[in-house]
Amino acid sequence: MTQAQELSVDFDFRLDGKVALVTGAASGIGAAIASAYATKGARIAAVDLNAEGAEALAAQLGGDRGAHRGFACDVADAASVQAAADAVAAEFGRIDILVNSAGVARLAPAEELSLQDWDSTLAINLSGTFLMCQAVGKRMLEAGGGAIVNMASQAATVALDQHVAYCASKFGVVGVSKVLAAEWGGRGVRVNTISPTVVLTELGHKAWDGPRGDALKKLIPTGRFAYPDEIAAAAVFLASDAAAMINGADLVIDGGYTIK
């Protein structure tokens, strides 16, 4: 496209004809993003360690027979990641969108955190994101385009008490994503991150109900936590062609927590 040409932007952020691979899709933010993508016309490859949960989510999305499928994957295992990416490509013929939403949080004071918890957090959150980006990114580069959305966190911007492994992993996700954006942007593959505050998924409710959550909300200018669909809305935009000029960005959705 030359500078003289006008860019036509779809303000409905439609994803018709696109195939989206979403990890961590069986529940929480991943499920919300998968559902939002489906409403925008995408076919969904719901990928999760919980194979039954992924298949159940795919079934709930409706649509034409075979429009959505569930796949099992351990994102911390390179062979499992490659097998899942290959299976999705074989089933749908292409992968246009990748969302890395699978993740864990092992919390403890830094001096008490076990090496096992450190290693598992980095393996799932950071290595898992890289491995899936690498496996799917190769296909996107061969196809000449794609959009990747990696879930980071406000913990990728500021230090959070008892979050040493989680912060390390999410700072890493942002770093990896920026490097991929720099390397792949010129070849048609955009890579961005979303960094939410506490999100009121089922796990979020359990972890942050009560006085602890009330205290944290007082530090957020908007005075509340985020809802899964608010994160999904951002993921829809970043995956859509309307975001064609957005590459290497970190979209912070934290009600202003990190500006203070």
From Swiss-Prot:
One of its GO terms (molecular function) is erythrulose reductase activity. Pathway: Carbohydrate metabolism; D-threitol degradation. CDD domains: SDR_c. Pfam families: adh_short_C2. Its EC number is 1.1.1.403. NAD(+) binds at residues 21-50, 170. One of its GO terms (biological process) is carbohydrate utilization. NCBIfam families: PRK06841.1, PRK07231.1, PRK12826.1-2. Catalyzes the NAD-dependent reversible oxidation of D-threitol. Involved in the degradation pathway of D-threitol, that allows M.smegmatis to grow on this compound as the sole carbon source. Does not catalyze the oxidation of xylitol, L-sorbitol, and L-sorbose. This is D-threitol dehydrogenase. The lineage of its organism: Bacteria, Bacillati, Actinomycetota, Actinomycetes, Mycobacteriales. The gene is dthD.
